Amino acid sequence: MTTHLDNMNSRKKQNWETPIDQFMEWCSRLGLSPAIDVCATKANTKCAKYFDKRSNGLKKQWTESWFMNPPYNEVAVWIRYAWNQFKEYGQDGLILVFNKTDTKWYHEFVWDQSKLKNRPNVETYPQSGRITFLENGTLPENPAPYGSVWIVFSKTKLRERLLRQCGL
């Protein structure tokens, strides 16, 4: 679940959904199989298990591999919590957020971490073009007004994950 700014009138909208084809493509491409969607609704979850607003993923332990497309007005809070959960439990995480490399959270939890030696693996994959997120299961007229980036927190590198996915 996420909030995007509407292209036409800058109103904030809730409950935008990651298109399932995008989610599946990136999971396959990155060798990931998230077990839990940590900020979703029953209608838009991408995983068999999910935390919704009522169960509050920010108060849960993420002891399984996870996916998140957080509310855009709360990205910093969710990224910080995701990083802490990753450090504590070491489960692979896949994150879809807006591609704004000038933000404090991006530098603190993505860019700075990727430069550290002996660090957990942090990978970024900018999305080509703009994603057209679903609204209540249907495509709106316009895509998101900015680009997106897929971020991976993992203890294993991409090559190792892909080999594992192939049973090697």
Can you say where each PLM-predicted feature lies in the sequence?
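Class I S-adenosyl-L-methionine-dependent methyltransferase catalytic core
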Residues: 1-168
